[in-house]
Amino acid sequence: RRGTKEVAKRTRAIIGSIFKYHMLYDVSERVKDSLEDFTSENHPHLTEKEDIKELLHKVDNYKGSYETRMALKFLSYTFVRSRPLREAEWTEIDGDMWRVPAHKEKTNRPLLVPLSTQAQALLKEIKEINGNKKYIFNSNYRDGFLSESTLGRILTRMGYGGKHSVHGYRHMASTCLNELEYDGDAIELQLSHAPVGVRGVYNKAKKLNYRTKM
């Protein structure tokens, strides 16, 4: 039809302008205070220091599956999402950096996870046992890695049912690190949360050294 292409071009230009304006000025910040707070109850997590110390102690002394125990310990150093943890492969480890491919991330973006000396030492120990396997946390499960329910089931057995979850490690880390006044952007980057507005589009500083210390 006559004029259809011109209408399409104008429409695309208008939509493009709207997106550019949002990215530059993040208009959502102006209305967030008028919205009701939403509190998720799906991911229980610990926040008190003594409770966290007890959790880490129980994981250290867990007598069940070696891979499961190591996965939970590694999670406490990296606080990544469940899938990247469970499906972690040796080929993703590059020295002091863990390169999580985009297809394993909820955000569909690759994630760089700087590894602390403790995390590297843990991987070195695991490699002596599972170094010949594809997956770091190898399992006899049909896919070769830990199932989604395995880690949660172990936490329940240790007495944390309804108190702390696998995803709760992320909430726990965020709460503790913010209380310790670590840089907010570094925390969000480590959690693979994309900063909104200008920061999300133009922020190229990954704060890797800072995140390693954090």
Label each region the model flagged.
Residues 1-33, 80-83:
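N-terminal DNA-binding recognition helix of tyrosine site-specific recombinases/integrases
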Residues 20-27, 75-97, 184-188:
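Short, charged phosphate-coordinating catalytic segments
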